[in-house]
Amino acid sequence: MAVLSKEYGFVLLTGAASFIMVAHLAINVSKARKKYKVEYPIMYSTDPENGHIFNCIQRAHQNTLEVYPPFLFFLAVGGVYHPRIASGLGLAWIVGRVLYAYGYYTGEPSKRSRGALGSIALLGLVGTTVCSAFQHLGWVKSGLGSGPKCCH
């Protein structure tokens, strides 16, 4: 039986925080549906005046949902051997997604680049997962930043 470290609790809290962020974005879409009168099941507005703003709010949420499963996978797996690093990167991803969404909400899609931190953090989580796999396979003896045989 494998035992997770006590520090894996940070990973669990980060996963819970990410759900709160996704729920916040969903609430914003719900409010925008009422404000811009976009009924279910219509995904996008065709209103020439305000439809663009609603569509940006909707896309910010949808794009986050598109990347959410890989985020959770890399957070959970990368956190097995590197819980603090994975949690820090996970929090950076959450902040990045909020910045991305609020940049997108302006109606100027180019402002979503404010959330680039999230993409960088996700790449870091991929790295922690690969490093964890190397450690688990015994290809390296220690983890990130732990001496001459760390995952670089």
From Swiss-Prot:
A lipid is attached at C150, C151 (S-palmitoyl cysteine). The keyword Membrane applies. Keywords: Lipid metabolism, Lipoprotein, Lyase, Membrane, Mitochondrion, Mitochondrion outer membrane, Oxidoreductase, Palmitate, Transferase, Transmembrane, Transmembrane helix. It catalyses: leukotriene C4 = leukotriene A4 + glutathione; 15-deoxy-Delta(12,14)-prostaglandin J2 + glutathione = 15-deoxy-Delta(12,14)-prostaglandin J2-S-(R)-glutathione; (5S)-hydroperoxy-(6E,8Z,11Z,14Z)-eicosatetraenoate + 2 glutathione = (5S)-hydroxy-(6E,8Z,11Z,14Z)-eicosatetraenoate + glutathione disulfide + H2O. GO terms for cellular component: endoplasmic reticulum; endoplasmic reticulum membrane; intracellular membrane-bounded organelle; membrane; mitochondrial outer membrane; mitochondrion; nuclear envelope. InterPro entries: MAPEG (IPR050997), MAPEG-like_dom_sf (IPR023352), Membr-assoc_MAPEG (IPR001129). Pathway: Lipid metabolism; leukotriene C4 biosynthesis; Lipid metabolism; arachidonate metabolism. Residues 1-8, 92-119 are mitochondrial intermembrane. This is Glutathione S-transferase 3, mitochondrial. The gene is MGST3.
